[in-house]
Amino acid sequence: MPRVKRGVTARARHKKITDAATGYRGRRKNVFRIAKQAVMRAGQYAYRDRRNKKRVFRALWIARINAAVRQHDVTYSVFMNGMKKVAIELDRKVLSDMAIADKAAFAALVTRIKSVVNAAA
């Protein structure tokens, strides 16, 4: 069996890592050992934060809905309870966008839910 030299595969492997590390500061961008560690850690952060992003955006949507609903003298929890009672299945992302972009439609929605909640109470 002939001897296989690793030049081509090693260069390709190193190039893949150094290409992924472009834009990093200091030796992290061009020293293979350090770049490899930096790329691995960046991958871990990216994996973790793809999951955290979902939590962060949900919290943002809830804060926006709460702020918009309080302008109509309703709390977020009462509003969402009314949404369930009326059987309107708009998610928080759409409600948040509606509160910003289409204030008239959002106000109509809030008044409808207020009437249902007040009738039940």
Swiss-Prot record:
On whether RNA-binding is a keyword of this UniProt record, the answer is: yes
Gene, per the UniProt record: rplT
Please list the disulfide bridges.
Answer: none
Task performed by this protein: Binds directly to 23S ribosomal RNA and is necessary for the in vitro assembly process of the 50S ribosomal subunit. It is not involved in the protein synthesizing functions of that subunit.
GO terms, biological process: ribosomal large subunit assembly; translation
Question: What do the Gene Ontology cellular component annotations say?
Answer: ribonucleoprotein complex; ribosome
Give GO MF terms, alphabetically: rRNA binding; structural constituent of ribosome
Which keywords does this chain's UniProt record carry?
Answer: Ribonucleoprotein, Ribosomal protein, RNA-binding, rRNA-binding
Show the PANTHER family listed in the entry. 39S RIBOSOMAL PROTEIN L20
UniProt name for this protein = Large ribosomal subunit protein bL20
The record's similarity note reads:
Belongs to the bacterial ribosomal protein bL20 family.
| NCBIfam families hit by this protein | rplT_bact
Source taxonomy: Bacteria, Pseudomonadati, Pseudomonadota, Betaproteobacteria, Burkholderiales
Q: Would the keyword Cytoplasm be found if you checked this record's keyword annotation?
A: no
Among InterPro entries, the record links this protein to:
Ribosomal_bL20, RIBOSOMAL_L20_CS, Ribosomal_protein_bL20_C
